């Protein structure tokens, strides 16, 4: 008789405890280390057991928090859903619902169009809307979520702060099946619907734009922030493009500690932080004359880099590409960039939330198409 692997035995035992209510929804499981000690097995074995539970949709793994029991459900699937396929399923409640919107921050380069689209779709759906900004602070995000729920909102759309750990309030909403949709930054391992861009594919395509034109020493520029899913995906896409060319992405040429564009620093330190970052970037550029191009993960970072290059007289020598761009009515682009479809992201997030408020508890991941918009010379004049 074939012997059942140890990790499957552990998985079966924990699964039975969950089904028999030994572990209830919201309970935290022992850590992988604790399980390995409890069952006298290796960490690898206990990790495989927990991964099986997660694959079954019995638990969710929250970085920095632990593994928690959730109501059994199918794991989310990545879908690309056109707007006209988001049809009504059930009527909304008799009284007009109000939804909450929690944003890290927003500006002309990214966020304003999305926010306007959310507001317009709320009107179409018969919703009221309440807006809260966290300004990059997790404590403000938590306070905002709690305040919105106390005020009785029917659901929440949230763009999480730059942090690899999720707030307890978000985990609580997932466990309680409170209607919530994340935008721009997905929460991996948490059963919450998401609407946003395929950042890895977009980053890969933008990096290939430079590689196709002969640039090989690209400086990757990102903010000083924990590796959120969005940043991780953009890094992965950048590296993948280099791998496809048989090249190595030299991380010694990367700038990874810019703070001025982060909402918390921008809000409270402003021009002082910007001056410090510009000084740091200029010093880095002078130290690495071999750099032939710059890839910024945000438009505001690209602007800072371009300003530094211009001060050194290198703006014509080293092209700068980025994600997002300013909202220019005549479609002029200062940099070649990934143009995200903010309007579609905004409207689809409201439609998904409306479905959840009506009772649809299927977790969806909706990837909205993007395109590469090339720089227009007139914008540089």
Task: Give residue spans per PLM region.
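An alpha-beta-alpha
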Residues: 206-248, 362-379
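HTH-adjacent hinge/linker in prokaryotic transcriptional regulators
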Residues: 51-129
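N-terminal helix-turn-helix
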Residues: 27-61
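Flexible loop/hinge segments that line or gate small-molecule binding clefts
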Residues: 159-204, 300, 324-335
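Extreme N-terminal segment that seeds HTH/winged-HTH DNA-binding domains in transcriptional regulators
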Residues: 1-40, 76-87
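Flexible loop/turn connectors
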Residues: 13, 17, 282-381
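Periplasmic-binding protein-like
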Residues: 100, 153-160, 219-222, 288-298, ...
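Hydrophobic alpha-helical segments within soluble ligand-binding/sensing domains
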Residues: 193-220, 236, 240, 274-282, ...
């Amino acid at each position: 008789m074939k012997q059942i692997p140890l990790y499957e035995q552990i998985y079966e035992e924990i699964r039975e405890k969950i089904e028999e209510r030994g572990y209830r929804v919201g309970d935290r499981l022992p850590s992988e280390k604790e399980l390995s000690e409890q069952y006298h097995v290796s960490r690898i074995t206990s990790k495989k057991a927990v991964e099986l539970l997660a694959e079954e949709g019995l638990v969710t793994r929250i970085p920095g928090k632990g593994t928690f029991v959730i109501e059994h459900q199918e794991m989310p699937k990545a879908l690309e859903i056109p707007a006209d396929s988001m049809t009504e399923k059930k009527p909304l409640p008799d009284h007009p619902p109000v939804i909450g919107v929690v944003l890290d921050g927003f500006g002309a380069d990214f966020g304003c169009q999305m926010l306007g689209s959310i507001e317009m779709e709320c009107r179409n759906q018969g919703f009221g809307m309440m807006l809260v900004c966290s300004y990059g602070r997790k404590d403000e995000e938590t306070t905002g979520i709690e305040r919105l729920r106390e005020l009785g909102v029917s659901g929440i759309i949230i763009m999480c702060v730059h942090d690899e750990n999720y707030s307890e309030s978000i985990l609580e909403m997932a466990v309680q099946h409170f209607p919530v949709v994340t935008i721009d930054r997905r929460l991996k391992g948490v059963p919450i619907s998401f609407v946003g861009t395929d950042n890895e594919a977009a980053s890969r395509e933008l990096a290939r734009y430079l590689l196709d034109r002969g640039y090989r020493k690209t400086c990757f520029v990102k903010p000083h922030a924990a590796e959120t899913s969005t940043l991780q995906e953009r890094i992965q896409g950048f590296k993948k493009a280099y791998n496809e060319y048989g090249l190595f992405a030299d991380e010694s040429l990367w700038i990874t500690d810019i703070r001025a564009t982060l909402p918390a620093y921008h809000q409270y330190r402003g021009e002082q932080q910007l001056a410090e970052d510009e000084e740091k970037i200029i010093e880095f550029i002078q130290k690495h004359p071999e750099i032939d191009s710059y890839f910024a993960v945000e438009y505001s970072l690209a602007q800072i880099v371009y300003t530094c290059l211009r001060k050194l007289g290198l703006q014509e020598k080293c092209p700068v590409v980025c994600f997002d761009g300013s909202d220019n009515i005549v479609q002029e682009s200062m940099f070649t960039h990934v143009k995200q479809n903010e309007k579609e992201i905004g409207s689809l997030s409201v439609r998904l939330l409306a479905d959840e408020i009506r009772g649809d508890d299927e977790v969806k991941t909706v990837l909205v198409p993007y395109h590469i918009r090339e720089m227009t010379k007139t914008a540089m004049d």
